[in-house]
């Protein structure tokens, strides 16, 4: 038994009748131990092993220096193992530091309110434009394939029901999982989705942001959700019921979301690796302005995709927006070309005209004399992008993970570390998790394509993206450049 300190028990000795002797008178001993009969000890396993093995030959004397050489190699191997362990610990600490920095940043962003964003914000045009793009993605890709437009107002016979409202048996609501929900800024957009939302689950690693999202949801419930009620032709209609919402603090890139009770209740497929996913229960997973944080390393990217694919039912959609890797690659390539041209001009002692031409090629990243190391950077008064280290000359980021840059957005983001999502690599990895690309467009192209849509065009006017009556765009050139840094997408679960 483990923990027993007693020695080995005495073993019974075999009986041998041939060795019997007459009993002898026992001599009294003055000492209790003197003359005591020694008990035979059972052979230990090591004794048995020694008795069975051949006697060791006489060890030959090693040549001088051989032992030292072996010792050096062993010490070097141990040293390398120690360095690897230290590097692993440092990498984990660094990753945790970045994760904490991002979380603390978004926790610290003040909740200024809708009126401030509409009136006092210096980037109100950009805010309105980005919100319109997110609404556009939700409007276009959130409904199920079997959804019939207008089902919320019609009964089973196609008759409008003002007093009773929609027949729940005839309409299935969406089950939405919002990863990186932040402060709940998209709750209103989901309430205005073409197909009504039945359940909304918001996840975010920033606990303060989750608290603010819960408060925003409570305010929406108090207002009745903002749909239905008194409107043209709907005076007798009951206010539309706001969807059921639940919110959780959760790192969706480092841990499985299966531990969340409502996720398990809706359905989560944890079957394993790429290509083996059946289906979860959610109709839509939304990831607005957050997926790029998962590309810090491959493990996080795959955990993120496993969570997304495990949560989505077959036919479900992953929608969202991320920084445009094509824009980043183009900017980096131009910057490096400008740096190279300037270095060559300086070495050759060319004229000031050559210097000026080289600087024009590097217009996206001004270089200051005396810098220890020139790194790619660009931007304007609204946003700034800066890489902390060297970047590929051709702008091709391989391997596709861990390419960090610092991003600044006026009034919103203060030099937060972000990661490039090389688009083709992302698309290929997503296919491993049964996610097939259906849509991908830069924000500026989304505007050009959808601005005259019969639904999305008027929506842009109501959201103050442009003036009423197909008026002028209320987004400055600097704001549009910042918006063009992003791309919207939709993947289908197959």
Q: Which residues fall in each region the model found?
A:
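Class I SAM-dependent methyltransferase Rossmann-like catalytic core
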Residues: 83-173
């Amino acid at each position: 038994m483990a923990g027993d300190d007693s020695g080995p028990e005495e073993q019974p000795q075999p009986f041998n009748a041939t060795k019997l002797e007459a009993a002898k008178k026992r001599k009294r001993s003055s000492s209790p131990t003197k003359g005591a009969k020694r008990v035979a000890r059972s052979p230990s396993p090591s004794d048995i092993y020694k008795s069975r093995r051949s006697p060791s030959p006489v060890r030959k004397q090693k040549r001088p220096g051989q032992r030292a050489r072996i010792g050096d190699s062993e010490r070097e191997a141990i040293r390398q193992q120690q360095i690897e362990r230290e590097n692993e610990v440092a990498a984990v600490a660094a990753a945790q530091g970045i994760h904490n920095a991002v979380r603390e940043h978004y926790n610290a962003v003040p909740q200024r309110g809708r009126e401030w964003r509409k009136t006092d914000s210096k980037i109100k045009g950009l805010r309105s434009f980005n919100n319109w793009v997110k609404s556009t993605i939700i409007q276009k890709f959130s409904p199920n394939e079997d959804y019939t437009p207008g089902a919320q107002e019609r009964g089973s016979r196609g008759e409008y029901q003002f007093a009773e409202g929609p027949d729940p048996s005839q309409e299935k609501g969406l089950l939405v999982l919002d990863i990186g929900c932040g402060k709940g800024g998209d709750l209103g957009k989901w309430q205005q989705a073409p197909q009504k939302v039945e359940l909304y689950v918001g996840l975010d690693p920033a606990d303060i942001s989750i608290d603010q999202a819960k408060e925003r949801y409570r305010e929406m419930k108090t207002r009745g959700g903002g749909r239905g009620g008194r409107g043209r032709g709907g005076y007798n209609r009951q206010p539309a019921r706001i969807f059921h919402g639940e919110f959780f603090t959760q790192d969706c890139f480092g841990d499985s979301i299966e531990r969340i009770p409502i996720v398990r209740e809706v359905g989560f497929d944890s079957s394993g690796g790429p290509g083996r996913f059946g289906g979860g229960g959610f109709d839509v997973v939304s990831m607005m302005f957050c997926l790029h944080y998962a590309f810090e390393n491959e493990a996080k990217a795959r955990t993120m995709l496993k969570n997304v694919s495990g949560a989505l039912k077959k036919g479900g959609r992953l929608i969202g927006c991320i920084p445009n890797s094509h824009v980043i690659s183009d900017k980096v390539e131009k910057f490096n070309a400008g740096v190279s041209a300037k270095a060559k001009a300086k070495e050759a002692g060319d004229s000031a005209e050559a210097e000026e031409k080289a600087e024009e090629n590097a217009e996206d990243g001004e270089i200051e004399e005396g810098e220890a190391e020139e790194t790619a950077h660009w931007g304007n008064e609204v946003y700034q992008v800066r890489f902390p280290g060297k970047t590929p000359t051709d702008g091709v980021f391989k391997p596709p993970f861990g390419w960090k840059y610092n991003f600044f957005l006026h009034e919103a983001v203060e030099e937060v570390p972000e990661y490039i999502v090389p688009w083709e690599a992302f698309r290929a990895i997503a296919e491993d998790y049964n996610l097939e690309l259906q849509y991908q467009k830069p924000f500026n192209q989304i505007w050009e394509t959808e601005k005259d849509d019969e639904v999305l065009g008027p929506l842009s006017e109501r959201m103050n993206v442009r003036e009423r009556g197909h008026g002028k765009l209320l987004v400055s050139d600097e704001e549009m450049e910042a918006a063009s840094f992003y791309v919207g997408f939709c993947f289908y679960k197959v």
